[in-house]
């Protein structure tokens, strides 16, 4: 795997050399030679990765190659950036720079020559020490694919004694196969170790299934399978054993015809255990005739397997075991001799066992591993010792042990393409149960070069590509994600505890990053010891109190420095010694919640010319230097600092690559910013018409998210004209003046892709809303006409929030058939609203309703009785008596699981 990750780095370096070839005047020969050397390195690495080598010699060589590639990329990119800075500088700087050109090119030639020498040395070492032979032979007596397949077959046979908590799932699956004529392919999907094979085997051996089907076949699909081999196994299963030799002699065409005819004339069930890729199923399925008596049950970690082209398809996702079932399974393994006649488990030992079970998250295979670890441990001392180190013990089990969860879960990782391996390893940055912001994650991946220019097709954005990567990891059941019902994109994601242990283990194995927790010098055991020099080029601090950059960070080759902070109720952490003179190669710098020394971002920040990602979210800083303008490679810049009226210098003219810009919410009145060159922006937050011209927005045609503060110097008519060409907008937030002196026509919102809309400004006659909206929030709009007749016709709308001053009328009507997709409705602070009519058939999918601080509203509508989807209603305390049990209006809400009041709960 290490070789594959390094190959990915070599490809990035090759692309850089190829794309910028015209910039290497005076060093062409050295660069051409470097490209040849990279090709040679790639050939070694391909052989290494193909054999999945594990020898220490090869690992050391690969690690050295990785360092060479990093150093080469730093040298080449530094040279190119200095050339670019010189060409975009003023006259005086260009004259001064001209005298240094020859010297710089000579130095660059020497640096590239040094890299080539190191490459030659490492290749010579590989040959002289026999490393190449070690790579070719691999040192394995048995291919890994065969070992994995044997493991799965062994596991699939050992299911009965550990069958716990799956009875309901078996019943459902048997029903799909036996009773449901409209279902022909059933897939059981979920993360490794969930018990998919155990479940499939129970279904396969069920009496109802045996009675329903004439023929049964079980095929364990290896990752390196051939179609011919799979078809042979199916035919052998479906026919007599005597024909085995005859079947082995058949070619693919004959196998296809035999199977097609057999499946056309019989009722057969075929189980495919552990299909990994969509393409695998596509290769297998031509043997199945359409609409006949056959059925297929398959297991996979990939949800998308078998979806394409199969109309009669059903995906079944079993849940992890509940705590009671987890404990039952654990007891069977950890205390195999215990039965009803024997004494109960020691109470203290039971408490400790249940605490350790939390690490398993209900994952059956993880529970088995834990039980196996503890089965031979009889004393409390043994259990306490394992309890402390349970994470590392689980992950550190050898892959030769068939009961090892690490082996099963790591298969998911090993199967990933190289770019997704990087994406997954990057998640090791985040602490346990941390909700990872998916938008920020996408930009971090891009800043690290994990997603590159070639990934962006047909106008795709960084967020599009990041989401596609994330969706692939979700399909492979390697991460868990959450998003609001009204959102069209991912909100946050996180790792299951067990998968996070795998992630940390792999990150340590690859020296991917180093983690320091709470204070300098205390480091997570999963990534090494921070008291020794930081070897990794990525460093993350979790909840530091103080960090001295020059003293505490000892790796001048660091590429990523990220600070994560959880407790925002304490004082900001202190950052000292921030000249950044030793960290000039940083690509990612996230200083969340920092308190700068003297509250000034140092001028030296401008020396970090490699920076792609800079975040000062919630930082205590009162001064931003003009040297920020040197950061021409920035794609992500967050200046949403925790300081009012900060002066922001006009530094954006050369930031042509910027995709995300979040400005301070409150800037000094003298701040004037020219943003017209930021034509690649995808997200712009806190744009103010006081500090910038609305005309700057005209060229930002890639914008998907725009948040504007509209001041009196710009009319709504001018703003509408400036944003009319932003055809890709999905999220639009406009906060403006509430003065009634402003024009009252409203905003022209002709955006066909707009999904989220927030309007906080006076526009009493707004009559039009985009048809694809999924969420709308209105405040201080002063609408004179009931907004419901317009909003309820928006077929995709899932969330509506009406806040204080959004509507000034007295009556609202929700018509039957209106709001067909609405799930959330919140109405707060409408002080003139008196009457609300909800007709039967309105809001049929509504789940959450909030009516607060609407003091003139005379009654809650009778129509709530007909909304059976409601799960939660929130009301002010003045309604409590009427809607309590026995109250005169209780009948309106008696079908709703939860009705909450300010200061109390009804149910």
UniProtKB/Swiss-Prot annotation:
SUPFAM superfamilies for the chain: L domain-like, P-loop containing nucleoside triphosphate hydrolases
Entry's free-text remark on domains: The LRR repeats probably act as specificity determinant of pathogen recognition.
Record carries keyword Transferase: no
CDD domains (UniProt xref): RX-CC_like
Entry annotated with the keyword ATP-binding: yes
Positions with a binding annotation for ATP: 190-197
A single MF term (Gene Ontology): ATP binding
UniProt LRR repeat ranges: 608-631, 843-868
Lineage: Eukaryota, Viridiplantae, Streptophyta, Embryophyta, Tracheophyta
Name by which UniProt lists this protein: Probable disease resistance protein At1g58390
Record keywords, A-Z: ATP-binding, Leucine-rich repeat, Nucleotide-binding, Plant defense, Repeat
Family the UniProt entry places it in: Belongs to the disease resistance NB-LRR family.
Disulfide bonds: none
TM annotation in the entry: none
Function per UniProt: Possible disease resistance protein.
Domain (NB-ARC): residue spans on this chain: 144-456
One Gene Ontology term from the biological process aspect of the record: response to other organism
InterPro entries registered for this protein in UniProt: Apaf_helical (IPR042197), Disease_R_plants (IPR044974), LRR_dom_sf (IPR032675), LRR_R13L4/SHOC2-like (IPR055414), NB-ARC (IPR002182), P-loop_NTPase (IPR027417), RX-like_CC (IPR038005), Rx_N (IPR041118)
């Amino acid at each position: 795997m290490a070789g594959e990750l390094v190959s990915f780095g070599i490809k990035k370096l090759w692309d850089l050399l190829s794309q910028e070839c015209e910039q290497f005047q005076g060093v062409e020969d050295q660069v051409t030679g470097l490209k040849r050397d990279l090709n040679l390195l790639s050939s070694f690495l391909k052989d290494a990765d193909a054999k999945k080598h594990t020898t220490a010699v090869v690992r050391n060589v690969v690690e050295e190659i990785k360092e060479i590639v990093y150093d080469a990329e730093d040298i080449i990119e530094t040279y190119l950036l200095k050339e670019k800075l010189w060409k975009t500088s003023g006259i005086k700087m260009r004259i001064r720079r001209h005298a240094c050109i020859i010297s710089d090119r000579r130095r660059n030639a020497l640096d590239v020559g040094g890299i080539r020498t190191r490459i030659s040395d490492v290749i010579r070492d590989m040959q002289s020490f026999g490393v190449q032979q070690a790579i070719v032979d691999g040192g394995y007596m048995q291919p890994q694919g065969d070992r994995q397949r044997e493991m799965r077959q062994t596991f699939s046979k050992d299911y009965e004694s550990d069958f716990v908590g799956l009875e309901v799932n078996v019943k459902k699956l048997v029903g799909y196969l036996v009773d449901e004529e409209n279902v022909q392919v059933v897939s059981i999907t979920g993360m490794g170790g969930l018990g998919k094979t155990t479940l499939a085997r129970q279904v396969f051996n069920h009496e109802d299934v045996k009675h329903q089907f004439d023929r049964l076949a079980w095929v364990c699909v290896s990752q390196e399978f051939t179609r011919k081999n799979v078809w042979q196994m199916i035919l052998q299963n479906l026919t007599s054993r005597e024909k085995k030799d005859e079947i082995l002699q058949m070619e693919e065409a004959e196998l296809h015809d035999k199977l097609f005819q057999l499946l056309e004339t019989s009722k057969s069930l075929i189980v495919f255990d552990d299909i990994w890729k969509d393409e695998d199923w596509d290769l297998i399925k031509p043997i199945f005739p359409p609409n006949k008596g056959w059925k297929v049950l398959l297991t996979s970690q990939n949800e998308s397997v078998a979806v394409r082209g199969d109309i009669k398809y059903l995906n079944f996702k079993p849940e992890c075991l509940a705590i009671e079932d987890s404990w039952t399974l654990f007891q069977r393994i950890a205390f195999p001799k215990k039965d009803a006649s024997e004494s109960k488990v020691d109470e203290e030992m039971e408490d400790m066992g249940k605490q350790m079970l939390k690490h398993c998250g209900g994952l059956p295979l993880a529970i088995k591993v834990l039980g196996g670890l503890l089965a031979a441990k009889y004393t409390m001392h043994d259990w306490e010792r394992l309890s402390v180190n349970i994470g590392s013990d689980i992950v550190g089990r050898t892959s030769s042990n068939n009961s090892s969860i690490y082996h099963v879960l790591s298969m998911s990782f090993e199967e990933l393409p190289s770019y997704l391996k990087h994406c997954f390893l990057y998640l090791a940055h985040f602490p346990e149960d941390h909700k990872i912001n998916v938008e920020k994650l996408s930009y971090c991946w891009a800043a690290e070069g994990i997603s590159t220019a070639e990934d962006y097709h047909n106008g795709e954005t960084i967020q599009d590509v990041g989401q596609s990567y994330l969706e692939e990891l979700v399909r492979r059941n390697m991460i868990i994600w959450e998003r609001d019902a009204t959102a069209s994109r991912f909100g946050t994601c996180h790792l299951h505890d067990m998968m996070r242990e795998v992630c940390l283990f792999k990150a340590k194995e690859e020296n991917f990053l180093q983690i320091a927790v709470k204070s300098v010098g205390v480091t997570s055991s999963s990534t090494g010891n921070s008291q020794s020099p930081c070897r990794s080029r990525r460093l993350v601090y979790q909840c530091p109190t103080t960090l001295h950059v020059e003293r505490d960070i000892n790796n001048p080759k660091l590429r990523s420095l990220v600070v994560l902070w959880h407790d925002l109720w304490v004082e900001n952490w202190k950052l000292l010694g921030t000249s950044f003179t030793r960290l000039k190669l940083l690509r990612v710098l996230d200083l969340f919640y920092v308190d700068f020394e003297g509250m000034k971002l140092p001028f030296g920040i401008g020396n970090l010319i490699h920076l792609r990602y800079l975040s000062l979210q919630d930082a205590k800083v009162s001064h931003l230097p003009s040297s920020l303008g040197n950061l021409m490679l920035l794609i992500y810049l967050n200046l949403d600092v925790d300081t009012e009226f900060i002066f922001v210098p006009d530094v954006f003219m050369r930031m042509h690559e910027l995709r995300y810009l979040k400005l301070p919410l409150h800037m000094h009145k003298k701040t004037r910013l020219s943003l017209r060159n930021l034509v690649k922006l995808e997200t712009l937050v806190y744009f103010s018409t006081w500090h910038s011209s609305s005309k700057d927005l005209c060229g930002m045609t890639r914008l998907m998210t725009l948040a504007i503060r509209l001041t009196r110097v710009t009319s709504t008519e001018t703003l509408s004209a400036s944003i009319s060409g932003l055809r890709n907008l999905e999220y639009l937030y406009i906060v403006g003046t509430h003065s009634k002196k402003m024009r009252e026509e409203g905003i022209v919102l002709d955006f066909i892709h707009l999904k989220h809309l927030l309007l906080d400004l006076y526009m009493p006659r707004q009559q039009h809303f985009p048809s694809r909206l999924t969420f709308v929030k209105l405040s201080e709009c002063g609408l004179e006409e009931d907004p419901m007749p317009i909003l309820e016709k928006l077929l995709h709308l899932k969330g509506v929030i009406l806040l204080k001053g959004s509507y000034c009328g007295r009556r609202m009507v929700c018509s039957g058939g209106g709001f067909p997709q609405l799930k959330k409705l919140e109405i707060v602070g409408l002080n003139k609203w008196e009457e609300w009519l909800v007709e039967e058939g309105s809001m049929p999918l509504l789940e959450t309703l909030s009516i607060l601080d609407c003091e003139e509203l005379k009654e809650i509508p009778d129509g709530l009785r007909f909304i059976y989807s409601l799960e939660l209603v929130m009301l002010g305390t003045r309604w409590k008596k009427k809607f309590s049990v026995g109250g005169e209006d209780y009948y309106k809400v008696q079908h709703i699981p939860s009705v909450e009041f300010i200061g109390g709960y009804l149910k």
